[in-house]
């Protein structure tokens, strides 16, 4: 196997090493370990509007205490909101179960983090980057791609790929003891039955007990909304209106938001009151192994429902079909860490220019528990939905007459005749047979 010189398998002593620092046990221990082993760690923390983070400003201070040469907090929220809206406009969601989608909130967060943190590192002349992703997951590849796209001279050093680090600090207990031994009164948080990763767009709960499919959504404590499955949690029906202008969500309940970050936060609050957007998915990781996750995305779900309602009321069938096909493909590219690749940009351009630009209007919904909702009203100056065209009542100046329909049906005789001929061929060859007691063609028993 050829050696990848971009990935450093041992600590680059004496060199600047940027680390994506969360302030948790793993990155705290890694930063201190790198410092004591002779590297020059620089800490970078992304403010992604994580709903489970109370004090972002405290994180860089903590990094300095653990030995960082410098620590910076990078505000990524505006860019994350921008990419979230782009995903809504393109329907870039390929994982779904029973019609309920996973809104690719973690891949969107990685696209923003991977580019903005590495860009900040370039400003500090830091060309080696490490983060906490493991070799079995998706993030190691996503960060690898986005990092090198942003800085082609980038080298990758991950403590979790360094055998010396693994031997010395291979587990949470060892990392905690290491911090205590070096004078830091670190108290391990109580471990949950699963791990959580979040940003402003959504939360991901996975691993540990959730790896077992007989552990359901009920073991999860939502961080962006309510446990709607709990009968003791009071959830009242609520009407909400969402307004779009040229594909961009701009108002909730009649209130306009100039700041997309505030818009998402309010959408999260509204949807979260009902548990909207929670889903349980089995998905294929980039390496084709299957994983399972419980997801939250109340704001994304609210915007997606309203946007697609307008899409179906404004665009024709072929456009909608292409939007859905392209969205599935784009969602997979996003999941794989290819959000800025040329094929993804091509699909994004198609949807944002030719689909989203026409999406102006307002949708009113009633939200109940979980993903239970009703659409109460749809308004748009661009609607091609015109009920008089198909009215069962007698109307003046009808769009077409009975004679027109007779002519249209007569033209169908051409393909009906062709289809009947093909069915005869299939029947003669044994591919189709008439089932017992049935006049409908059925697949034959021949192998």
Swiss-Prot record:
Alphabetical GO biological process terms: argininosuccinate metabolic process; L-arginine biosynthetic process; urea cycle
Pfam families xrefs: Arginosuc_syn_C (PF20979), Arginosuc_synth (PF00764)
Subunit structure: Homotetramer.
Known pathway: Amino-acid biosynthesis; L-arginine biosynthesis; L-arginine from L-ornithine and carbamoyl phosphate: step 2/3
Amino-acid biosynthesis among keywords: yes
Catalysed reaction equations from the record: L-citrulline + L-aspartate + ATP = 2-(N(omega)-L-arginino)succinate + AMP + diphosphate + H(+)
Subcellular location, record wording: Cytoplasm
Top-rank EC class of the record's enzyme: ligase
Major location category of this protein: cytoplasm
InterPro entries per UniProt: Arg_succ_synth_type2_subfam (IPR023437), Arginosuc_syn_C (IPR048268), Arginosuc_syn_N (IPR048267), Arginosuc_synth (IPR001518), Arginosuc_synth_CS (IPR018223), Arginosuc_synth_type_1_subfam (IPR023434), AS_cat/multimer_dom_body (IPR024074), AS_multimer_C_tail (IPR024073)
Residues engaged in binding ATP: 20-28, 46, 132, 134, 139, 197
EC number: 6.3.4.5
Binding site for L-citrulline: 102, 138, 142, 195, 204, 206, 283
Protein name: Argininosuccinate synthase
């Amino acid at each position: 196997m050829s050696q990848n010189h971009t990935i450093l398998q041992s600590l680059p002593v004496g060199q600047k090493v940027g680390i994506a620092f969360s302030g948790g046990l793993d990155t705290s221990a890694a930063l201190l370990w790198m410092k004591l082993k002779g590297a020059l760690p620089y800490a970078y923390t992304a403010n992604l509007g994580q709903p489970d983070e109370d004090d972002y400003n405290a994180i860089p201070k903590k990094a300095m205490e653990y030995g960082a040469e410098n620590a910076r907090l990078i505000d990524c929220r505006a860019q994350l909101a921008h990419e979230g809206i782009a995903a809504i406009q393109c329907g870039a969601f390929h994982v779904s179960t029973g019609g309920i989608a996973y809104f690719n909130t973690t891949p969107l967060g990685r696209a923003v983090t991977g580019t903005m943190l590495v860009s900040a590192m370039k400003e500090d002349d830091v060309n080696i980057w490490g983060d906490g992703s493991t070799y079995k997951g998706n993030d190691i590849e996503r960060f690898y791609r986005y990092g090198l796209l942003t800085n082609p001279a980038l080298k990758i050093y991950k403590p979790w790929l360094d055998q010396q680090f693994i031997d010395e600090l291979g587990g949470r207990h060892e990392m905690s003891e290491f911090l205590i031994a070096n004078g830091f009164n670190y108290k391990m948080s109580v471990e949950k039955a699963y791990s959580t990763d979040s940003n402003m767009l959504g939360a991901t709960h996975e691993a540990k007990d959730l790896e077992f499919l007989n552990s359901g959504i009920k073991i999860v404590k939502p961080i962006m909304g309510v446990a709607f499955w709990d009968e003791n949690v009071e959830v009242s029906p609520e009407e909400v209106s969402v307004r779009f202008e040229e594909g961009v969500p701009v108002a909730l309940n009649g209130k306009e938001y100039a700041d997309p970050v505030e818009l998402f936060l309010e959408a999260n609050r509204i949807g979260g009151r009902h548990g909207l957007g929670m889903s349980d998915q089995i998905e294929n990781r980039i390496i084709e192994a299957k994983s399972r996750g419980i997801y939250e995305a109340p704001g994304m779900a609210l915007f997606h429902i309203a946007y697609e309602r307008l899409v179906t009321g404004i665009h024709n069938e072929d456009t909608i079909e292409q939007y859905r096909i392209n969205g599935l493909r784009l969602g997979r590219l996003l999941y794989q860490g290819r959000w800025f690749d040329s094929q993804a940009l091509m699909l994004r351009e198609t949807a944002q220019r030719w689909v989203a630009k026409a999406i102006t209007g307002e949708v009113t919904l009633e939200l109940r528990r979980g993903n239970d909702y009703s659409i109460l009203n749809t308004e748009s100056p661009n609607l091609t939905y015109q009920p008089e065209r198909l009215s069962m009542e007698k109307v003046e100046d009808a769009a077409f007459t009975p004679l027109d329909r007779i002519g249209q049906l007569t033209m169908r005789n051409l393909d009906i005749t062709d289809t009947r001929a093909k069915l005869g061929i299939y029947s003669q060859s044994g591919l189709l047979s008439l089932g017992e007691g049935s006049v409908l063609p059925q697949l034959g028993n021949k192998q």
